Amino acid sequence: MRIRTIGLFIGAALVVGCAGTPGPGDAGYPYNVDGDYSGSFTVDGLTFTGTMQISTQPGGAVTGTLSLNRPVQINGTIDGTLTGDQLTVGIKYGSNPATGCSGGTVEGALTISEHGASISGPVTVVDCGEMLDATINFSR
């Protein structure tokens, strides 16, 4: 009986020890970003509005799409990494009717609110070879 009790105790300790705290992409992680977000992207005094559809994969990889629709249509793909409450993001977009350029990039470190309700922060845009400071502010 004593050996059985010790075995049950060790088994319970292993289960508790292996459960651990969820990491990026795991169910229950407080900063996962998943779903549809709407908001603004402000660059050089011009505010664009639109949507992002994103998801966090196991290990913290983040993928998705960006669709800005006002004042012009710009579409891009999102790739990033979630660490803690920070999303290091890279966005590649196609044609920009506002500048006439055939595409550009956006990079930055965004802050995620708890439960992934909002995504915001400064980014750098490279469009037509010019670097511009910008701000992203999206929420569910």
Give residue ranges: language-model regions.
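Repetitive helical segments and hydrophobic/amphipathic motifs
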Residues: 11-13
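C-terminal motif of bacterial Sec signal peptides marking the signal peptidase cleavage site
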Residues: 15-17
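Central antiparallel beta-sheet cores of small beta-barrel/beta-sandwich binding domains
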Residues: 27-116, 120-140
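Bacterial signal peptide processing site
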Residues: 19-22
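A near-ubiquitous, low-amplitude feature marking generic local secondary-structure context
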Residues: 8-9, 37
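Bacterial N-terminal signal peptides that target proteins for export
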Residues: 1-8
